[in-house]
């Protein structure tokens, strides 16, 4: 699997627990690789969903 977990916006992806991608914009991605999450957001691994056109996500807002 692509370690960068790249996919189209609003697409689906299955990021591994060790995923460290920074460009993942998948709505289905529930790992800390959501690009809208700040580094060190402890809640991101608990179900982060990036909001469209936003620099924050549902768990880090």
Curated annotation (Swiss-Prot):
Described purpose of this protein according to its UniProt entry: Metallothioneins have a high content of cysteine residues that bind various heavy metals; these proteins are transcriptionally regulated by both heavy metals and glucocorticoids.
Organism superkingdom: Eukaryota
Positions that bind a divalent metal cation 3: 15, 19, 24, 29
Protein name: Metallothionein-2
Organism: Rattus norvegicus (Rat)
Gene Ontology CC entries for this record: cytoplasm; nucleus
Lineage: Eukaryota, Metazoa, Chordata, Craniata, Vertebrata
GO BP annotation list: cellular response to cadmium ion; cellular response to copper ion; cellular response to zinc ion; detoxification of copper ion; intracellular zinc ion homeostasis; negative regulation of growth
Residues recorded with modification N-acetylmethionine: 1
């Amino acid at each position: 699997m692509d370690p960068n977990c790249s996919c189209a916006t609003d697409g689906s992806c299955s990021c591994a627990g060790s995923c460290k991608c920074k460009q993942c914009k998948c709505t289905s991605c529930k790992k800390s690789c959501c690009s809208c999450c700040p580094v060190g957001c402890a809640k991101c691994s608990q179900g982060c969903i990036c909001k469209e056109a936003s620099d924050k996500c549902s768990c880090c807002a």
